[in-house]
From Swiss-Prot:
It comes from Treponema denticola (strain ATCC 35405 / DSM 14222 / CIP 103919 / JCM 8153 / KCTC 15104). InterPro entries: Antibiotic_NAT-like (IPR028345), DUF436 (IPR006340). Gene3D superfamilies: Hypothetical protein TT1679. NCBIfam families: TIGR01440 family protein. Disulfide bonds: none annotated. This is UPF0340 protein TDE_1278. Belongs to the UPF0340 family. The lineage of its organism: Bacteria, Pseudomonadati, Spirochaetota, Spirochaetia, Spirochaetales.
Protein backbone atom coordinates (compact mmCIF):
# COMPACT_ATOMS: atom_id res chain seq x y z
CA UNK A 1 0.00 0.00 0.00
CA UNK A 2 1.34 3.40 -0.95
CA UNK A 3 -0.13 5.40 1.95
CA UNK A 4 -1.68 7.97 -0.39
CA UNK A 5 -5.23 8.37 -1.64
CA UNK A 6 -4.91 7.33 -5.29
CA UNK A 7 -8.52 8.26 -6.10
CA UNK A 8 -7.91 11.78 -4.81
CA UNK A 9 -4.66 11.95 -6.83
CA UNK A 10 -6.62 10.96 -9.94
CA UNK A 11 -9.32 13.58 -9.30
CA UNK A 12 -6.76 16.35 -8.65
CA UNK A 13 -4.83 15.41 -11.80
CA UNK A 14 -7.91 15.49 -14.02
CA UNK A 15 -9.11 18.77 -12.49
CA UNK A 16 -5.72 20.41 -13.08
CA UNK A 17 -5.51 19.08 -16.63
CA UNK A 18 -8.98 20.36 -17.50
CA UNK A 19 -8.06 23.81 -16.17
CA UNK A 20 -4.89 23.86 -18.28
CA UNK A 21 -6.67 22.60 -21.40
CA UNK A 22 -9.17 25.43 -21.10
CA UNK A 23 -6.43 28.05 -20.65
CA UNK A 24 -4.08 26.69 -23.32
CA UNK A 25 -6.62 25.94 -26.09
CA UNK A 26 -4.79 22.76 -27.13
CA UNK A 27 -6.01 20.91 -30.21
CA UNK A 28 -5.58 17.45 -31.69
CA UNK A 29 -1.96 16.80 -32.58
CA UNK A 30 -0.58 19.18 -29.93
CA UNK A 31 1.80 17.95 -27.23
CA UNK A 32 1.45 18.33 -23.47
CA UNK A 33 4.54 17.60 -21.36
CA UNK A 34 4.37 16.18 -17.85
CA UNK A 35 7.07 16.57 -15.26
CA UNK A 36 6.23 14.61 -12.13
CA UNK A 37 7.93 13.74 -8.86
CA UNK A 38 5.93 10.95 -7.29
CA UNK A 39 8.22 11.31 -4.28
CA UNK A 40 6.79 14.81 -3.77
CA UNK A 41 3.24 13.60 -4.48
CA UNK A 42 3.70 11.05 -1.68
CA UNK A 43 5.02 13.66 0.76
CA UNK A 44 8.71 12.88 0.32
CA UNK A 45 11.67 14.68 -1.21
CA UNK A 46 12.10 14.73 -4.99
CA UNK A 47 14.12 11.76 -6.20
CA UNK A 48 14.08 9.89 -2.89
CA UNK A 49 10.80 7.95 -2.71
CA UNK A 50 9.46 7.11 -6.18
CA UNK A 51 5.95 5.67 -6.03
CA UNK A 52 4.91 3.40 -8.90
CA UNK A 53 1.20 3.47 -8.01
CA UNK A 54 1.14 7.28 -8.00
CA UNK A 55 2.98 7.40 -11.34
CA UNK A 56 0.57 4.96 -12.95
CA UNK A 57 -2.45 6.80 -11.49
CA UNK A 58 -1.31 10.22 -12.75
CA UNK A 59 -0.30 9.08 -16.23
CA UNK A 60 -3.48 6.99 -16.64
CA UNK A 61 -5.61 9.96 -15.57
CA UNK A 62 -3.93 12.27 -18.07
CA UNK A 63 -4.25 9.75 -20.89
CA UNK A 64 -7.96 9.24 -20.13
CA UNK A 65 -8.56 12.90 -21.01
CA UNK A 66 -5.88 13.53 -23.65
CA UNK A 67 -6.27 10.46 -25.87
CA UNK A 68 -9.93 11.11 -26.84
CA UNK A 69 -8.91 14.67 -27.80
CA UNK A 70 -5.97 13.48 -29.91
CA UNK A 71 -3.47 15.38 -27.75
CA UNK A 72 -0.09 13.70 -27.30
CA UNK A 73 1.49 13.27 -23.86
CA UNK A 74 5.26 13.48 -23.36
CA UNK A 75 6.57 12.48 -19.94
CA UNK A 76 9.87 13.88 -18.72
CA UNK A 77 12.26 11.55 -16.93
CA UNK A 78 14.58 12.62 -14.13
CA UNK A 79 18.12 13.94 -14.32
CA UNK A 80 19.57 10.40 -14.24
CA UNK A 81 18.42 9.96 -17.84
CA UNK A 82 19.15 13.60 -18.75
CA UNK A 83 15.45 14.49 -18.57
CA UNK A 84 14.75 12.38 -21.67
CA UNK A 85 11.06 12.00 -22.44
CA UNK A 86 8.72 9.12 -23.18
CA UNK A 87 6.47 9.87 -26.13
CA UNK A 88 4.32 7.88 -28.53
CA UNK A 89 6.12 6.82 -31.73
CA UNK A 90 3.35 8.54 -33.74
CA UNK A 91 4.18 11.89 -32.14
CA UNK A 92 7.93 11.36 -32.49
CA UNK A 93 7.52 10.68 -36.21
CA UNK A 94 5.05 13.52 -36.78
CA UNK A 95 7.36 16.13 -35.25
CA UNK A 96 10.66 14.57 -36.34
CA UNK A 97 12.08 14.23 -32.83
CA UNK A 98 15.29 12.22 -32.63
CA UNK A 99 14.95 8.93 -30.78
CA UNK A 100 17.49 8.07 -28.07
CA UNK A 101 18.37 4.77 -26.42
CA UNK A 102 17.35 4.53 -22.79
CA UNK A 103 14.58 2.76 -20.92
CA UNK A 104 13.17 4.49 -17.83
CA UNK A 105 13.43 2.68 -14.53
CA UNK A 106 11.97 3.51 -11.14
CA UNK A 107 15.16 5.19 -9.90
CA UNK A 108 16.50 6.33 -13.28
CA UNK A 109 13.67 8.13 -15.02
CA UNK A 110 11.13 7.94 -12.26
CA UNK A 111 7.72 6.42 -11.65
CA UNK A 112 5.81 8.66 -14.08
CA UNK A 113 8.13 8.02 -17.04
CA UNK A 114 8.17 4.31 -16.19
CA UNK A 115 4.36 4.31 -16.13
CA UNK A 116 4.20 6.12 -19.46
CA UNK A 117 6.67 3.68 -21.00
CA UNK A 118 4.45 0.80 -19.87
CA UNK A 119 1.09 2.42 -20.72
CA UNK A 120 1.84 3.95 -24.13
CA UNK A 121 0.94 1.93 -27.23
CA UNK A 122 4.33 2.39 -28.90
CA UNK A 123 6.69 4.28 -26.56
CA UNK A 124 9.96 5.80 -27.68
CA UNK A 125 12.44 7.98 -25.85
CA UNK A 126 13.52 11.40 -27.09
CA UNK A 127 15.96 13.94 -25.72
CA UNK A 128 14.06 17.14 -26.45
CA UNK A 129 10.47 18.13 -27.16
CA UNK A 130 8.77 21.40 -28.02
CA UNK A 131 5.46 20.93 -26.24
CA UNK A 132 2.56 23.35 -26.54
CA UNK A 133 1.83 23.24 -22.79
CA UNK A 134 2.90 21.42 -19.68
CA UNK A 135 2.06 20.34 -16.16
CA UNK A 136 4.77 20.21 -13.51
CA UNK A 137 3.93 18.17 -10.43
CA UNK A 138 6.54 18.58 -7.71
CA UNK A 139 8.87 21.25 -9.13
CA UNK A 140 10.61 19.07 -11.73
CA UNK A 141 11.30 22.06 -14.02
CA UNK A 142 9.66 21.45 -17.40
CA UNK A 143 10.28 24.86 -18.97
CA UNK A 144 13.02 23.49 -21.22
CA UNK A 145 10.42 21.27 -22.89
CA UNK A 146 7.72 23.89 -23.58
CA UNK A 147 8.09 25.88 -26.78
CA UNK A 148 8.95 29.56 -26.69
CA UNK A 149 7.20 31.75 -25.46
CA UNK A 150 6.21 30.03 -22.21
CA UNK A 151 3.38 31.60 -20.25
CA UNK A 152 2.64 30.55 -16.63
CA UNK A 153 -0.93 29.39 -16.04
CA UNK A 154 -2.30 29.88 -12.53
CA UNK A 155 -4.51 26.92 -11.73
CA UNK A 156 -7.11 26.65 -8.98
CA UNK A 157 -5.67 23.22 -8.23
CA UNK A 158 -2.43 23.98 -6.36
CA UNK A 159 -1.35 20.48 -5.30
CA UNK A 160 -1.43 16.90 -6.51
CA UNK A 161 -1.13 14.94 -3.29
CA UNK A 162 1.61 16.77 -1.38
CA UNK A 163 3.36 18.07 -4.52
CA UNK A 164 3.16 21.69 -5.63
CA UNK A 165 1.60 22.10 -9.06
CA UNK A 166 2.57 24.57 -11.77
CA UNK A 167 1.55 24.80 -15.41
CA UNK A 168 2.68 26.47 -18.61
CA UNK A 169 1.15 27.23 -21.96
CA UNK A 170 2.88 28.76 -24.96
CA UNK A 171 2.17 31.53 -27.41
CA UNK A 172 3.84 32.82 -30.59
CA UNK A 173 6.54 35.45 -30.17
CA UNK A 174 5.44 39.07 -30.52
CA UNK A 175 7.96 40.58 -32.92
CA UNK A 176 8.36 43.92 -34.61
CA UNK A 177 8.63 47.48 -33.46
CA UNK A 178 6.33 50.33 -32.56
CA UNK A 179 4.30 49.91 -35.77
CA UNK A 180 3.68 46.20 -35.28
CA UNK A 181 0.10 44.96 -35.02
CA UNK A 182 -0.56 41.83 -32.96
CA UNK A 183 -4.26 41.24 -33.55
CA UNK A 184 -5.42 40.01 -36.95
CA UNK A 185 -6.98 42.77 -39.03
CA UNK A 186 -9.66 41.47 -41.38
Amino acid sequence: MSGIDLEKIKEETIAALNELLEAASLKAGDILVLGCSTSEVSGGVIGKASNEEAGRTIVSALLSVLEPKGIFLAVQGCEHINRALVIEKESQEKYGFEEVSVVPALHAGGAASLAAYNLFKSPVMIEHVRAHAGIDIGDTEIGMHVKFVQVPVRLKTKYIGSARLTALKSRPKLIGGERAVYEKVL
